Every structure is written in C-alpha cells, then in structure tokens.
C-alpha cells in the first residue's frame, strides 16, 4: 500500500504476517523490520522548498507520524480517500528531519518538474491526477515486493499481487501472478 503504518485499514477476522507500506519503502512484521528505505534528508528539504515555491503544502511521513505544513483542496481530498484528516503540525520542521519514507502533496502533471527540481534520490509515483506520493528513487512497490520475497524465501513465481492504479504497475511486474483491477 501507499499508506503509512498508522493508516493501515483493519479487516475483521484477517491477520497479516507482514506489511508493505509507503509504496514499498517500509516493509515489516509485528516483530521485525524487513526493509527500511527512507528518502535522504537533503532531498526531503529540497522537495519542501520546491513545494513551498509552488504554493503547495505537503505531508512528510515517518513510521509513526504524518505531519503537514498546511493544507489545500487537493491534499484534503487526497487524504479523504483514506478516510484521514490532515495534521498541520507545529513541529513539522522537526519531523522533516526524522526518517521520512514518503512525502505527499497536491500536484498537477505540469508541476512535477518544478516539484522535483534539484532532487537526486527521490521520484514521483501517483494514481490520481491531483496529488502525488514522493518515494526514494530506488524504492517502489516492486522493490518492496522483492524484499518481502527474499525475507520469506519465496520465488517470484510463488507470489501474487493485486493492483488498481498506475502506481501498482511495477508491483504487478515483480510477481509471477499480477492482477490488474479496474
């Protein structure tokens, strides 16, 4: 999922052995981290600077926290898809210096180049045309799946994934049985 560990949905009667969150950047079990791939702090700060220049508030996401420096219509609606509300945090700058696994902001396709200007180790992924998730360049759902398969000693041919958006394509390619849902 692109969600944070604190925003995972609960399914009555279903227990999961492991979780792949932040579009594959943080994978874990109840007892152990499987894969931890935060965005370099200098890139986090550059993205914040670029978003500010565009007049776009954003959210930084750590393992335990989602902290925003403001909100706009696009970010509010993006959060609503996960039935969440934005936390405009007084300590945003402090949280931005922690291990940030993902940033979220409203953004049109035309804004993507300016948002990522001078950013070396992060990239955009998105499934909606009005907001983006920003993840490590060497991350993504495909990389998260690879790390999960390694951890459990499974071959790609033994894995199945379901996806419903553009940000799921690499995940579907990283398993033996990828199912694209409409």
PLM regions and their residue ranges:
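Well-formed, non-transmembrane alpha-helical positions, independent of function
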Residues: 10, 170-174
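Short, structured coil segments at secondary-structure junctions
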Residues: 14-15, 23, 118-121, 174-175
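Active-site glycine-centered loops adjacent to acidic/histidine catalytic or metal-binding residues
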Residues: 1-2, 164
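Short, polar loop motifs at secondary-structure junctions
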Residues: 3-4, 24, 107-111, 182
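Short, well-ordered beta-strand core segments
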Residues: 19, 178-180
